[in-house]
Amino acid sequence: MNQFMLLGFIAFGGAFGACARYLISELCVVLLGKGFPYGTLTVNIVGSLIMGVLMSSLNQGIIEAAPCRPIIGLGFLGALTTFSTFSMDNVILMQQGEVIKAGLNILLNVTLSITACFIGFQLMKS
């Protein structure tokens, strides 16, 4: 696969990931309100679960690396999940004096995202 085609695959996946992130974030606001960054937490957990499934599937040869890895791993998941928004959410919470909420958000994002990735990986091993 040439580099131009690879970039096209990544952009294709990224377009869907960005749209999914927006829709999930908006849905979280409607369902859960604006008092906590539920949207960022949700996309990071879901993205980590998908990454675990993807990597386990690639390792086992269930799916072929090209073009799945660049489309899903780099494009879709790169646009869906975000560390910069996670960081900004916590800075805003701390600036608002919501130190406990910021700590809870950090704990939940890190713990649940890693757990979801592990679960996704294990699901594909069985």
Swiss-Prot record:
Function per UniProt: Fluoride-specific ion channel. Important for reducing fluoride concentration in the cell, thus reducing its toxicity.
Top-level taxon in the UniProt lineage? Bacteria
Q: What membrane topology does this protein have?
A: Multi-pass membrane protein
Gene it is expressed from: fluC
This protein's name: Fluoride-specific ion channel FluC
One of the protein's GO biological processes: cellular detoxification of fluoride
What family is this protein classified in?
Belongs to the fluoride channel Fluc/FEX (TC 1.A.43) family.
> Can you state which reaction this protein catalyses?
fluoride(in) = fluoride(out)
Gene Ontology terms for molecular function: fluoride channel activity; metal ion binding
Ranges annotated as spanning the membrane: 4-24, 35-55, 71-91, 104-124
Binding positions (Na(+)): 78, 81
- Report the principal subcellular site: membrane
Cite the entry's keywords alphabetically: Cell inner membrane, Cell membrane, Ion channel, Ion transport, Membrane, Metal-binding, Sodium, Transmembrane, Transmembrane helix, Transport
